[in-house]
Each structure stands twice: as structure tokens, then as C-alpha cells.
Amino acid sequence: MTYQALPDGLFIQNSPIAGQGIFTNKPLEVGTELGISHILDGKDMYRTPLGGFINHSDNPNCEKYRVNMKYYVKVIRSVDPMEELTLKYTFYRV
């Protein structure tokens, strides 16, 4: 298997929200798994490009969830092509 920084169809570009963000060039349906955003390793946490470039929104189209020592991102509402992917950030959690 070849490593991909972002899943097919996702790309990084300047964001109207802040700095740069992650966008899609294809429609994404509810429940689509986008991949790993963070990996826990003891006291350390490593961020992937997916976790590093996804911006905050109070009305996000994605959510993160934890399985063992990894955080994943999935789509929680339909996303149109060229729409930015967003999460609702929390202060004390990844």
C-alpha cells in the first residue's frame, strides 16, 4: 500500500475560514470515512495532514472519533465539490 497524505479527491488550498483548509473535488456522502487525523503514542500525539489542515466551524460537515490510539474523521452531512471540510474544535480534546 502506498502512503497518501490525503485521500483521493481531497486537496489543500487557501481557506476563507483561516489560512489553508482541506477541500473536496467530488461529492462526499454522510458516513464517508476520510482517514486518520491524529495518532497517540504514549504522551505524544502526531498529526497527519488531514488533522493539520482541517479548519473549525460551528456547523461542521465532519466529525472526529477515536478508535484505540487513533483519531479518524468522517463526513456527518453531505459535502459538495469545492466545499471546505470542517470540524468543530474543542478546547481540551483533539
Which residues does each PLM region occupy?
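Conserved catalytic SET/PR domain of SAM-dependent protein methyltransferases, capturing the structural core
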Residues: 1-94
